Amino acid sequence: VRYSPLLHLNEGLVYDEIVGAVQEGLDLARRQYGIVCGQIICGIRHISAASSLELAELAVRWKGRGVVGFDLAGAEKDYPAKDHIEACLYVLNNNINITIHAGEAFGAPSIHQALHYCRAHRIGHGTHLIEDLDLMAWVNDRRIPVELCLASNVQTKAIPDLQSHPIRRFMEEGLRVTLNTDNRLVSGTTVTNEYRLAVENYDLSEDEVLGLVMNGFKSAFLSLKDKTQMVDQVLTEFASQGAAFSGEISRRRRSQI
């Protein structure tokens, strides 16, 4: 669950109460339905670096109690990621993973900043990575996950239409591509719908669909043990769907997380 507590300070609520309330819901989901979910706390680029640092400190306080990562979201243009470097370094120094929205509403230099200044472990959107092939190769070589959001990118005009999205090129180059919703409420989408859009618009094979699913689990901000268990569960589920996936499943069982 990725959100900014800064946007929920209503009726006297304070940061720790907000995170605690969210965690109660996630704990209940895990007990009742077996859903495993962590919290990613977001700083907001266009609000202030000071508030991002407060949220970074909040993330560190809740490390080991549900918070698994820190994000930097909000307007890219005129609000560079490097302005929030203090917040990013604070969470890094406390061994918390970082993902940063970059390359959605601004070009490849925004992605470069997120990676080389703020040292992000994942890139949110990354649509404009296609504009810098050298940086794209660097991202690929380091298996940095790229969190693509198809419906959202069309709605925000990051791309003119789905046919213009670089997902197919990214996949052909071997990038660790994942499919995401961005904002379910604003975009009116689901993870299932994002996969439907991908299959219908980019002629994905069954093996490619499995690859995208696996990339998502491999890129999760979870422990190696938890990710390994989830990957095994997913492969077992796909195996139950028939022989179509058998060759790819055998290969992926041998691959590294």
Where are these regions (language model features)?
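Short, small-residue-enriched loops and turns at beta-alpha junctions
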Residues: 9, 44-50, 74-80, 100-107, ...
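Flexible, acidic glycine-rich loops studded with aromatic residues
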Residues: 161-216
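Divalent metal-dependent hydrolysis catalytic cores, especially in the metallo-beta-lactamase
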Residues: 1-11, 36-42
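Mid-to-C-terminal alpha-helical segments outside catalytic/metal-binding sites
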Residues: 203-257
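Conserved, mostly hydrophobic/aromatic
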Residues: 70, 101, 123, 146, ...
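Histidine/acidic residue-rich metal-binding segments in metalloenzymes
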Residues: 19-31, 35-38, 51-69, 78-100, ...
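Glycine-rich tight-turn/loop motif centered on a GG-T
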Residues: 7-17, 77-81, 117-124, 152, ...
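Active-site neighborhoods of metal-dependent hydrolases
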Residues: 124-127, 132-181, 234-257
